[in-house]
């Protein structure tokens, strides 16, 4: 499901960029692959609606300006409270687009759409805990800069996981415990990379998020962790 979620993210990025020409080609290809050519207009409409929904919730340029203006005044929490108050609407946007692309993701992945929705809801809840205190602290402590500095290291972490699952067939041949172990290796790699930054907050935040999301995943019972 991971790569299908990435695909949806790419769709969304195109929608937000107001460049639908590239999305049309990808949607057509994906729908054709799953014998759902007739669903192309329906999926495109869902993606357009998703893009408009997101634009109605946040203007990224405005948000960036608000963050920069709030940093010197220590008012980041006020900025994120305003946006976290819209989290229920954001969850609705995501739910709608996940259901909207269902006809073109194939039966194997369609069965995991609810899991994807639960995961994104958990992510939103984590980020917006206490009206966004976590994300405010993350930015105030140089989190984005840390991620930027460690981009290549993080890419390596993801690439190592991808090489463990080069094909759908190879992934299916692994047991759940084996899959969870591979994912745990990747997340440990991420945290270790971020620990090299000048402040501990980015690594601590990433580790907390990973633990938070793992707790409600099949890996929590299949491969329990004591720490």
Swiss-Prot record:
Where does the secretion signal sit in this chain? 1-17
Q: Which keywords does UniProt give here? A: Glycoprotein, Secreted, Signal
Subcellular localization? Secreted
InterPro entries listed in its UniProt record: DUF1397 (IPR009832)
- Glycoprotein: present as a keyword of the record? yes
- Does this UniProt record's set of keywords contain Signal? yes
The record's account of tissue expression is: Expressed in the subesophageal body, fat bodies, hemocytes, midgut and Malpighian tubules. Not expressed in silk glands.
Which top-level group of life is the source organism from? Eukaryota
Glycosylation is annotated at 118, 173
One GO CC term on file:
extracellular region
Give one Pfam family, short name only.
DUF1397
**Which family would the database say this protein is a member of?**
Belongs to the UPF0408 family.
Protein name (database record): 27 kDa glycoprotein
């Amino acid at each position: 499901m991971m790569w299908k979620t990435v695909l949806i993210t790419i769709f969304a990025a195109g929608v937000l960029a107001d460049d639908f020409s590239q999305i049309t080609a990808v949607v057509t290809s994906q729908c054709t692959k799953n014998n759902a050519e007739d669903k192309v207009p329906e999926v495109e409409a869902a993606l357009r609606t998703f893009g408009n929904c997101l634009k109605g919730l946040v203007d990224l340029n405005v948000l960036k300006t608000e963050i920069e203006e709030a940093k010197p005044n220590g008012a980041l929490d006020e900025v994120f409270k305003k946006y976290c108050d819209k989290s229920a609407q954001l969850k609705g946007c995501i739910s709608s687009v996940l259901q909207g692309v269902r006809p073109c993701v194939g039966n194997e992945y369609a069965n995991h759409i609810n899991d994807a929705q639960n995961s994104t809801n958990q992510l939103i809840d984590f980020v917006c805990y206490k009206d966004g205190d976590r994300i405010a602290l993350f930015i105030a402590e140089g989190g984005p800069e840390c991620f930027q500095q460690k981009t290549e290291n993080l890419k390596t972490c993801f690439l190592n996981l991808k090489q463990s699952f080069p094909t759908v067939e190879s992934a299916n041949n692994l047991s759940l415990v084996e899959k969870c172990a591979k994912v745990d290796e990747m997340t440990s790699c991420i945290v270790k990379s971020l620990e090299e930054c000048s402040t501990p907050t980015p690594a601590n935040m990433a580790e907390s998020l990973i633990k938070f999301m793992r707790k409600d995943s099949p890996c929590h019972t299949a491969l329990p962790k004591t720490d």
